[in-house]
Amino acid sequence: MEITSAEFVISNTDVKKCPTGVFPEYAFIGRSNVGKSSLINMLTARKGLAMTSATPGKTMLINHFLINQSWYLVDLPGYGYARRGQKGKDQIRTIIEDYILEREQMTNLFVLIDSRLEPQKIDLEFMEWLGENGIPFSIIFTKADKLKGGRLKMNINNYLRELSKEWEELPPYFISSSENRTGRTEILDYIENISKEVYKNK
């Protein structure tokens, strides 16, 4: 898929105020500081489309970007930022859960995982919750350029092994790097193929 246009549409905290219409939505979510904004900018080839920050947990809104006048890329708040107070954590959880459970246009949720880390309990529990609620999702392992030699493959295999303990069938997954654009073609082609099916069935 070639990205010919990408524009910011709206930010809000209320799923009921999200854009109307039938365009499929592909949402991106992950723990704070997983590299979500950098990935979005890399996928869209728009350096400043999603604002990056040195401060984890900065994204606290549902951000809609219209891509190619045919689908929405949705930047969801990050979860699990330790320095956010309990009230703030509860607010973010409500925003995330309301969007995921209520937004009919959401076609696929991309869960971002830092490939440098061992499987984190918060990520595993979140994906388990998605499975329990029948939410279609895929995994994107980020920051692949930060690992040398066979470490990347070993980390991902460890993660898949951990997921296999709870899942009979593993979700699709992608390996990405915002620095060298690894995974860009695969992720965009995946979105394009799903969108074709969506429009074919309308």
From Swiss-Prot:
Which residues bind GTP per the record? 30-37, 57-61, 75-78, 142-145, 173-178
Residues annotated as domain EngB-type G: 22-197
Which PROSITE patterns does the record match to this protein? G_ENGB
User: What cystine linkages occur within this chain?
Assistant: none
Q: Which InterPro entries match?
A: G_ENGB_dom (IPR030393), GTP-bd (IPR006073), GTP-bd_ribosome_bio_YsxC (IPR019987), P-loop_NTPase (IPR027417)
> What is the stated purpose of this protein?
Necessary for normal cell division and for the maintenance of normal septation.
**HAMAP family per the UniProt record, alphabetical:** GTPase_EngB (MF_00321)
Q: Which NCBIfam families match?
A: GTPase_YsxC
Q: Which family does it belong to?
A: Belongs to the TRAFAC class TrmE-Era-EngA-EngB-Septin-like GTPase superfamily. EngB GTPase family.
Put simply, this protein is called: Probable GTP-binding protein EngB
Native species: Bacteroides thetaiotaomicron (strain ATCC 29148 / DSM 2079 / JCM 5827 / CCUG 10774 / NCTC 10582 / VPI-5482 / E50)
